[in-house]
UniProtKB/Swiss-Prot annotation:
ACTH and MSH are produced by the pituitary gland. Glycans are attached at N91. It comes from Sus scrofa (Pig). This is Pro-opiomelanocortin. It is found in: Secreted.
Length: 267
């Protein structure tokens, strides 16, 4: 009787397992191990025969079944329901009606083809290197992005050494005046001494003006262009430091008041 109850419970357990698996093939029930379920040994043999089929068709449960290789490629799983998905399509729109997996795989393949068909060497034997056309990021939208250096002025090269000495001897404004002056008309070759004397006088006058300007710059700086540079004496310190003559009428007024008060008290 206990063995019969055990066989009935085993048969019931086997029936529940077979009903739980939706894709169980028919050969498992038609095998010789599952024909006679009266004994416990036959029941265990039938369960062993149907166990591989159950493990392949049913979801993976904790146990020895989870050690089997996955039927689908895990790389095909794409989180297309997130908007930051790199390979999926936005808003769940995919090619065909098979979900986001097919469109994601197709897009990934297109990116691999565009990248040069994988990291291996190309047909010409040259390995793909880093992108040379990629510009470095510069914060030009900030005013401190590109520090402005000192502007270099072009160096003027003169054909003869006389003009070089002249450029070193005179300041910039005098050189501009010399450059803007009209050229002298051609003179007779019989009077070269007059041209040399005129040039010597011009250079002497320019040197004298330059020395006078340097002496003027050496003096103390006066802020005459500001109204507080040198205020008049009668307006210094708010007008309190005035001469004694301006205070004479006030002293006379005080004396007259004192005399009047003394005269009234004497009466």
């Amino acid at each position: 009787m206990p063995r019969l109850c055990g066989s009935r419970s085993g048969a019931l357990l086997l029936t529940l397992l077979l009903q739980a698996s939706m894709g169980v093939r028919g050969w498992c029930l038609e095998s010789s191990q599952c024909q006679d379920l009266s004994t416990e040994s036959n029941l265990l043999a039938c369960i062993r025969a149907c166990k591989p089929d159950l493990s392949a068709e049913t979801p993976v449960f904790p146990g020895n079944g989870d050690a089997q290789p996955l039927t689908e490629n895990p790389r095909k799983y794409v989180m297309g329901h997130f908007r930051w998905d790199r390979f999926g399509r936005r808003n769940g729109s995919s090619s065909g009606g098979g979900g986001g997996g097919g469109g994601a795989g197709q897009k990934r393949e297109e990116e691999e083809v565009a990248a040069g068909e994988g990291p291996g060497p190309r047909g010409d034997g040259v390995a793909p290197g880093p992108r040379q056309d990629k510009r470095s990021y510069s914060m030009e939208h900030f005013r401190w992005g590109k520090p402005v250096g000192k502007k270099r002025r072009p160096v003027k090269v003169y054909p003869n050494g006389a003009e070089d000495e002249l450029a070193e001897a005179f300041p910039l404004e005098f050189r501009r005046e010399l450059a803007g002056a009209p050229p002298e008309p051609a003179r007779d070759p019989e009077a070269p001494a007059e041209g040399a004397a005129a040039r010597a006088e011009l250079e002497y006058g320019l040197v004298a003006e330059a020395e006078a300007a340097e002496k003027k710059d050496e003096g103390p700086y006066k802020m005459e262009h500001f109204r507080w540079g040198s205020p008049p004496k009668d307006k210094r310190y708010g007008g309190f430091m005035t001469s004694e003559k301006s205070q004479t009428p006030l002293v006379t007024l005080f004396k007259n008041a004192i005399v009047k008060n003394a005269h009234k008290k004497g009466q």
